């Protein structure tokens, strides 16, 4: 970003991304539990529900609900944003997973795609705002840049245009020399 915004002389630069409240922390819960592991096939996937999938990572406890076990295991508030996001994603539902086999990561992806999938006429949008505050020659300065990208439909999405397409172009250029 330094050269892109003409900030080559800046000694220290920090970059961060803000997402919806609780999103990153909720994803971290899934990582800590082991739900994103793609190195081994799970057993019994064909009979799993969303809830039993998540329960597979918490250990058996006859008297405690899944939500309580996750809260206790990871030191989370029972009414915190992490569990609220997991609940919104449908992970505590007794809905059948709908796969015959898969790794934890594949099962999780399948569950989340049911909730996050765009319908044929849906469109996505990416809004980015960069603000750089820096000191140069003893004076405070600021540069701002924005990007708004709109998807055309559920296939030609803003995400595909801004992430997938540039990556595909780069790969093709590398392959073509």
State each model region's role.
Residues 1-177:
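C-terminal catalytic/substrate-binding lobe primarily of soluble NAD(P)-dependent oxidoreductases
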């Amino acid at each position: 970003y330094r050269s892109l915004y003409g900030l080559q002389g800046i000694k220290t630069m920090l970059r961060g991304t803000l997402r919806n409240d609780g999103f990153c922390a909720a994803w971290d819960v899934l990582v800590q539990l082991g739900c994103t592991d793609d190195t081994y096939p799970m057993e019994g996937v064909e009979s799993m529900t969303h809830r039993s999938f998540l329960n597979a990572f918490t250990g058996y406890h006859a008297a405690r609900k899944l939500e309580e076990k996750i809260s206790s295991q990871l030191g989370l508030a029972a009414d915190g944003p992490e569990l609220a996001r997991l609940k919104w994603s449908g992970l505590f539902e007794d809905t059948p997973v709908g796969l015959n086999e898969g790794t934890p990561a594949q099962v999780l992806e399948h569950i989340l795609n049911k909730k996050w999938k765009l319908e044929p006429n849906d469109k996505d949008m990416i809004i980015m705002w960069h603000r750089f505050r820096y000191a140069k020659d003893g004076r405070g300065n600021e540069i701002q840049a924005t990007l708004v990208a709109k998807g055309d439909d559920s296939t030609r999405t803003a995400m595909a245009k801004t992430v997938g397409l540039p990556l595909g172009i780069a790969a093709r250029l590398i392959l073509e020399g």
